[in-house]
């Protein structure tokens, strides 16, 4: 674990930035090496050295490295997006996930239309055995090429598999 490595003789990033002498009991030294000056500067700008020091003092030693990693990530994101921070990143990923789920439903609908499966029996959102068999059979890269003009039966026969009925 990084917090238990022997220290070099130079000051930690926190003491360098704060222009103070680094003591052997410095709470920042195990987690902000002298080479991590930019990381500590971001954490200091967002949270403040005093708050980080108090926080690290309250966290059990075995969890401090993860705490520092979390603070560094939050500070990085907060500086990029001061209003929303990590929540903005999460919301963006959730929006992207919904878009991809929609695209998947559209692709499944098109596949069902081309496969000859009765659309009233199978929903494009269901994981039907017929659809699962087709998706396992067709390479992912080829799914992107199916645009409605492709003869699906011929494609399946080219793979050596009969079309499912």
UniProtKB/Swiss-Prot annotation:
Residues 10-111 form the LOB domain. Pfam families: LOB. InterPro entries: LOB. Belongs to the LOB domain-containing protein family. PANTHER family: LOB DOMAIN-CONTAINING PROTEIN 21, LOB DOMAIN-CONTAINING PROTEIN 4-RELATED. This is LOB domain-containing protein 21. The gene is LBD21.
